[in-house]
């Protein structure tokens, strides 16, 4: 009897076939992804615990500084943030990759829509569980496929709660991801400390480039220490034309051509950027131009003003950190990614704290008492993350436009907007950025394969 029942099932199967036929092919391709075979992988914290899991990225070993983020979403933006250059990023969210990885599509300004830079910047990825089957209308590949294509090793199936507990108690530590082999204690000397590397030099453009609104109303110079695409978008969408300069460009020598100066985010120890600090100090001595800095830009501005910076025990990396505006008493929920902070007690007398972190009381911003200069440690452009503080870009652009108007009153012939010829000559995106370690590994493997052939 049961045999007769099961033989009667084809009609139901044909109905399912018709349903499948009505589903878009791209979605079905997502659903039908084959579960890949995983190699063994090991995540080792130097002088600390060892965690065994499965590799789902590039088949290569890597070392760097292990840091963690508690952000629930936004892994494509986080992993392409130049501020993570040289770091192994541990995600506390239990499941990562469920909405895949989008394409490198660009918007009307030529800026990447879904990434913060063209390449995956983190040295390695650590997750508790990775979604091998993803679904999102913008997705074109899985997190594992993306990591493999970018040469970045990634490990899943490890106890990220234990890892984060260790990092919170001991502080950010050097670590390594080893794929396809057992951990060897004799390899400890191979641990790479990104804090000893001038990371900003790696991620900064090597030549100026220009991005502009369709009808720019002001012209802003951006100091590129590893600028995120959404910072550029936040400026351009408010009517600014922007020319982006290398981190060590003597901006004080050309500031009179601009209506404002912006200092970007970036990776590593701020004290490595001695050239930037010097040029900013000279800029504040010789010009009244409005200045805005974010993250590393905030720290560099503080150093230029005469303050000091300190390294945090494990940093602040999340989308939900409360920061108090000391001028209004308003609390903002902010997006953050930094391992250093400004020591507010060392601010000169003509500066005052602007924001303070309500979790650890660290400084989150500063403002000049008499000039249009301010900076924030958190990211008001927040992609991903809350937009509570995005109005700071409005405040900055307003000050830029006021400065432009005041300069026009004194210098009627002054035109801060670049000539069309200059705009045509300048590049439209970063120039000469040093490839990530992952991309270097891929290039080396390709060279070796070609030589063997």
From Swiss-Prot:
Pathway: Amino-acid biosynthesis; L-arginine biosynthesis; carbamoyl phosphate from bicarbonate: step 1/1. It is found in: Mitochondrion matrix. GO terms for molecular function: ATP binding; carbamoyl-phosphate synthase (glutamine-hydrolyzing) activity; glutaminase activity. Residues 1-28 form a transit peptide. Its EC number is 6.3.5.5. Keywords: Amino-acid biosynthesis, Arginine biosynthesis, ATP-binding, Glutamine amidotransferase, Ligase, Mitochondrion, Nucleotide-binding, Transit peptide. One of its GO terms (biological process) is glutamine metabolic process. It catalyses: hydrogencarbonate + L-glutamine + 2 ATP + H2O = carbamoyl phosphate + L-glutamate + 2 ADP + phosphate + 2 H(+). It is an enzyme of class 6 (ligase). One of its GO terms (cellular component) is carbamoyl-phosphate synthase complex. SUPFAM superfamilies: Carbamoyl phosphate synthetase, small subunit N-terminal domain, Class I glutamine amidotransferase-like. Pfam families: CPSase_sm_chain, GATase. InterPro entries: CarbamoylP_synth_ssu (IPR006274), CarbamoylP_synth_ssu_N (IPR002474), CarbP_synth_ssu_N_sf (IPR036480), Class_I_gatase-like (IPR029062), CPSase_GATase1 (IPR035686), GATASE (IPR017926). The keyword ATP-binding applies. Residues 219-406 form the Glutamine amidotransferase type-1 domain. The active site is at 295 (nucleophile), 379, 381. CDD domains: GATase1_CPSase (cd01744). Heterodimer composed of 2 chains; the small (or glutamine) chain promotes the hydrolysis of glutamine to ammonia, which is used by the large (or ammonia) chain to synthesize carbamoyl phosphate. Belongs to the CarA family. Small subunit of the arginine-specific carbamoyl phosphate synthase (CPSase). CPSase catalyzes the formation of carbamoyl phosphate from the ammonia moiety of glutamine, carbonate, and phosphate donated by ATP, the first step of the arginine biosynthetic pathway. The small subunit (glutamine amidotransferase) binds and cleaves glutamine to supply the large subunit with the substrate ammonia. This is Carbamoyl phosphate synthase arginine-specific small chain. It comes from Aspergillus fumigatus (strain ATCC MYA-4609 / CBS 101355 / FGSC A1100 / Af293) (Neosartorya fumigata). The lineage of its organism: Eukaryota, Fungi, Dikarya, Ascomycota, Pezizomycotina.
């Amino acid at each position: 009897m049961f045999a007769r029942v099961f033989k009667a099932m084809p009609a139901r199967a044909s109905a399912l076939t018709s349903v499948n036929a009505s589903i878009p092919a791209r979605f079905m391709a997502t659903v039908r992804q084959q579960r890949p075979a995983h190699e063994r992988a090991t995540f080792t914290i130097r002088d600390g615990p060892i965690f065994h899991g499965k590799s789902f990225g590039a088949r290569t070993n890597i070392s760097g500084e292990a840091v963690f983020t508690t952000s629930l979403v936004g892994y494509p933006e986080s992993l392409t943030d130049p501020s993570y250059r040289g770091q192994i990023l541990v995600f506390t969210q239990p499941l990562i990759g469920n909405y895949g990885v989008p394409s490198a599509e660009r918007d009307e300004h030529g800026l990447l829509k879904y990434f913060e830079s063209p390449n995956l910047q983190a040295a390695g990825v650590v997750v508790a569980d990775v979604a091998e089957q993803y679904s999102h209308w913008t997705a074109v590949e899985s997190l594992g496929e993306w990591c493999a294509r970018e040469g970045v090793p990634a490990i899943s199936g490890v106890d990220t709660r234990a890892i984060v507990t260790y990092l919170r108690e001991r502080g950010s530590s050097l670590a390594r991801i080893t794929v396809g082999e057992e951990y060897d204690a004799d390899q400890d000397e191979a641990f790479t400390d990104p804090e000893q590397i001038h990371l900003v030099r790696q991620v900064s453009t090597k030549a100026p480039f220009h991005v502009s609104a369709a009808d720019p109303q002001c012209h802003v110079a951006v100091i590129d220490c590893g600028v995120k695409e959404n910072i550029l978008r936040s400026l351009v969408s408010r009517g600014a034309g922007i020319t982006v300069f290398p981190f060590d460009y003597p901006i004080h020598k050309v500031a009179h051509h601009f209506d404002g100066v912006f200092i970007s985010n970036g990776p590593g120890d701020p004290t490595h950027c001695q050239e930037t600090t010097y040029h900013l100090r000279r800029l504040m001595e010789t010009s009244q131009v409005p200045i805005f800095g974010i993250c590393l830009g905030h720290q560099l501005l503080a150093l230029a003003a005469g303050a000091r910076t300190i390294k945090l025990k494990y940093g602040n990396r999340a989308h939900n950190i409360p920061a108090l505006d000391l001028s209004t008493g308003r609390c903002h929920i902010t997006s953050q990614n930094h391992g250093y902070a400004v020591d507010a007690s060392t601010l000169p007398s003509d500066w005052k704290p602007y924001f303070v972190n309500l979790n650890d009381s660290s400084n989150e911003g500063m403002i000049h008492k008499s000039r249009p200069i301010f900076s924030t440690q958190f990211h008001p452009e927040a992609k991903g993350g809350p937009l509570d503080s995005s109005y700071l870009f409005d405040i900055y652009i307003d000050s830029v436009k006021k400065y432009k108007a005041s300069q026009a009153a004194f210098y009627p012939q002054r035109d801060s907007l670049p000539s069309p010829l200059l705009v045509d000559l300048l590049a439209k995106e970063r120039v000469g950025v040093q490839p990530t370690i992952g991309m270097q590994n891929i290039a080396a493997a390709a060279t070796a394969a070609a030589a063997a052939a």
